[in-house]
Amino acid sequence: MKHLLLLLSFLITTNVLAQSINTQVDAKKPYLVGKINKEGLETPPYSSWFEKNYQAGKPDPAVIEQLQTQLSEYTIKAFLGTWCGDSRREIPKLYNVLDAAQFPLDRLTTVALDKRADSYRQSPGGEQEAMKVFRVPTIILFKDGKEVNRIIERPKVSIEADLLAMIAGNYTPNYADVTALMELMEELGPEKFERKLDRIARNQGAQLEHYYGLHTLAKVWYAAHKQDEAITITRLNCKLFPQEKGPKLLLASYMEDRGLTTDAGVLYREVLQLEADNTTAKNALKRLDTK
């Protein structure tokens, strides 16, 4: 009886572990969430873009030769969205580079993130927590359990060249300015950050070229129940990019979600001043008028 119970326990555990890899969300356009592996990406419908972009990758042989002798001391975590064009382009290239460099794939952890609003860029297992992932793909290089550096959204040169530059300690990723603001928010907290908003906008915020990074970060924070941080960073985004509709619409939706309909209405009207026929703002104002 004892042996039977042990066998049943083993089978149940094995089944659970098997189910935790390559989990698919059966939406109109299916996508993967949670931990995945190469086999999952080689399975339809993902194989249609994975195999094409894997084969399209032509890594530099000279760089690969250096990675073959240096990369084995590291581990890698890659976060992607199988629904994301940048991920579909870069993650197959990552696998191509790692295969060429003879990097053992058991030292690679690949995590697919959700795209639904209430779990935006989250993983069911929470693997992205504390990893400060806000754009995908994000490819993080570790040594002895400590982060060395990361590729955010796309490489500066190529996957292989960027990995080598990270190993050499000579690399600054895309969205470094957004990452710095994220860390400042963590240091100050949303209330103090809000009080210093004008100063932050003049200093750190002045480095930003567009609103997309903070916009995505706000959505990630809001889905992760960091609403105060999301609202504060979106206020900064509105201040930095007053002629952009996106941050105003996002902040208005947050205000509406909190029942601050007057504040939401002001923001929707500001959007209409920028674009008189904006359907989202028009419909929102009609909705607010009925409340």
Outline where the language-model segments fall.
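Thioredoxin-like thiol-disulfide oxidoreductase module
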Residues: R107-L141, A165-I167
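Non-catalytic, surface beta->alpha helical segment in thiol-disulfide oxidoreductase systems
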Residues: R135, F142-V178
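Helix-start (N-cap) detector for alpha-helical repeat units in TPR-like alpha-solenoids
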Residues: Y211, Q227-D228, K245-L249, T279-T280
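Alpha-solenoid helical repeat scaffolds
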Residues: H215-T216, G246-L250, V266, K282-A284
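Residue-level recognition of tetratricopeptide repeat
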Residues: K219, S253-Y254, R287
